[in-house]
Every structure is written in structure tokens, then in C-alpha cells.
Amino acid sequence: MFNPHVLDVPAVIFDNGSGLCKAGVSGEIGPRHVINSVLGHRKFNMPSARLNQYFVGQEALYKFDALHLHYPIKRGLVTGWDDMEKLWKHLFEWELGVKPSQQPVLMTEPSLNPREIREKLAEMMFENFSVPGFYLSNHAVAALYASACVTGLVVDSGDGVTCAVPIFEGYSLPHAVTKLYTAGRDITEHLTQLLFANGFNFPCILNKAVANNIKEKLCYIALEPEKELRKSRGEVLGAYRLPDGHVIHFGDELYQVPEVLFAPDQLGIHSPGLSKMVSSSIMKCDTDIQNKLYAEIVLSGGTTLFPGLEERLMKEVEQLASKGTPIKITASPDRCFSAWIGASIMTSMSSFKQMWVTSADFKEYGTSVVQRRCF
């Protein structure tokens, strides 16, 4: 028998990303735990009850030499279901210390998430974890909520995908969503390749963690890349101390690498860059709301944290929009957690209680219930 009072308990919130999973409890100002979305399975089978057969998150990355690393979320979509189940189990039991059967669960999902993935998420939560209530919230809608808005355009860029999502009165407009499959992971790989191509000789192997760190600490978006190249050619623009103590110096690579967000053709990807994505998404919307979207552009996701990105986007969107169009870009300092924070706010509201898909609903209608109830 379903007990409706279980929906009064603070919800567990999972913001599942290609690179990081953010987990916490509704009503809090940020996620309690942020872990790498990776599982490591032992390369050699060692049947022993005392030995972990797999490792999760940072621990898996530390032991990468002895493990096969699996990333269950690719380009924002769950593809490795067994590993994803293990990751959620780890978050429930070891990170949050909660019993899934005693708290409802909200998960964020990417725009245009395929039906089969949405239904599989519901099936797994209700059947494998016995949750009393479940909801799928559009990642961009949740991020916009964190900015106290219900109408606007969210530019979201994480580890696996970059997208522009127009939202009107709390609902995303799927026909106008634009996606670019260039994001944080591609920039890290591009950085590694560019450094080796430019003849950098590293005293230690440049692994992904070091490359990521260089990207996050030193890379930036140039306001005018061609001018920057003329101005800085041959100059040292930044230095980084490797784990073994050696210091390496960088030049033009620091702005050339993230430039792929605005010019993806540099990676051989024939898609519009960030500024044209924004313009294209807005132009696909009804003319009556276009100005409202330009007036509330919200940045979300860790890959939007590059210094200079907000200014460059503003400059180019102004050039693409009709003359005199008021444009505002909001770039919250904690925008890497925007979707999680928005979901926390959403689930804290008393009106949200009626939104939950309950275990009784699932039992009566099956997996298709999420198609009707989660927008």
C-alpha cells in the first residue's frame, strides 16, 4: 500500500552528467557529493569476497592502471545501465547514507532525452531501488529555475554536450533546441593533442586529470582570437607545476583550445558554434517571445566557466541579433551546479508534491507514465 506521507520527506536529487554526478537532498543550497561518473572494473578477475570487484568515481581514477574504466553516461545519455545502477547504489548507500525506498528521487535529464532512456530510468528507480516517488526534470529548465526565472534561454555546456535550450513559462521548446557535441571532454583531449603536436616534452605522462587541471586553471576565451594571436605570439601566457615538480609554460594554446566552442570546425565538426546556436534557437521560436529569450540568457555547466566566455558570447550575439535588441547574460559563479540547485528549489515547493510519479502510478500505468507526467 502506497503511503502518500513519504512524499513529504526531502527528496534525493541526482544531476547525472557525462563527467560528474551531483547528489544531495532537496532544500539544501548545493549538492552534498560530486563524484566522477566513472566505474573501474578489475583487469584481472580475483574472486574474493574481501576484494572490491569495482571502484567508483575518484577512487577508480586513482587506480586506473589496474582497472578497465567505464563511463556509463556518454554525450549526456545513459548507455551503460549496469554500471549506472552501481553508481547510484554507491551514491545512495555510501555517499548520502539513505534508503531509496524511503525518499522520492528527482533526476535531471538532457533535452531531447530519448523515450526509451526516460522509461528505463523510471523502471530502474521503481523496480531496482523501490523508490516511492520519481520525477525527471529537464536539465535546462532546472538551471533556469536556479536563476529565479521561468522564461529564458539556457546555454548549457558540461563534459559531453553543449546545448542551447529556449524555455517558455517553465517548459522547454524541443523544436528549437540546438546541440553541439563538443564540450569539456573534447576540449581536454584537444589540449593534450595540441601540446604534444607543439613539441612539449613532459617529464611525466600527461594524464587526463593533469590535462583537466591545466584547462580549468589556465585556459580562457579570447574576445578577438586573431588580435590575440598577433599580440601574444611567442609570449608565455601561463605556467603550470606538474605533480613531479617540473614547471611547464604555455602560450597561445591557452585560448586556442577552448576556441572550439565558438569554432567547432577546428575539430572537423560542421556545426554552428555557441553564438550561432543561441541565435538559431531563438529564431526558431515564436516572434512574440524572441525578445524575452534574448533578455534572459543563462549560462549553465562547468564548461561555461572559462574566463572571457560571457563577454565573447555577448559581443557575438549582439552582432547576430537585430539592432537595439536588449540582451542580458546571467553567469552565476556556481553555475556548474545550476541544474542541481534549481531542482532543489523546485522540489522544496509545496506545489511540487502533486508532480511526483508515485510507485502506485508506476504500478498502474507502467513505464510510459513518465511520458505523460514529466515534461
Swiss-Prot record:
SMART domains: ACTIN (SM00268). It comes from the Eukaryota. Its main location: cytoplasm. It holds the Pfam family Actin. Keywords: Cytoplasm, Cytoplasmic vesicle, Cytoskeleton, Nucleus, Transcription, Transcription regulation. GO terms for biological process: negative regulation of DNA-templated transcription; regulation of smoothened signaling pathway. GO terms for molecular function: chromatin binding. InterPro entries: Actin (IPR004000), ATPase_NBD (IPR043129). Gene3D superfamilies: 3.30.420.40, Actin, Chain A, domain 4. GO terms for cellular component: acrosomal vesicle; cytoplasm; cytoskeleton; nucleus. It is found in: Cytoplasm, Cytoskeleton; Cytoplasm; Nucleus; Cytoplasmic vesicle, Secretory vesicle, Acrosome. Negatively regulates the Hedgehog (SHH) signaling. Binds to the promoter of the SHH signaling mediator, GLI1, and inhibits its expression. Belongs to the actin family. This is Actin-related protein T1.
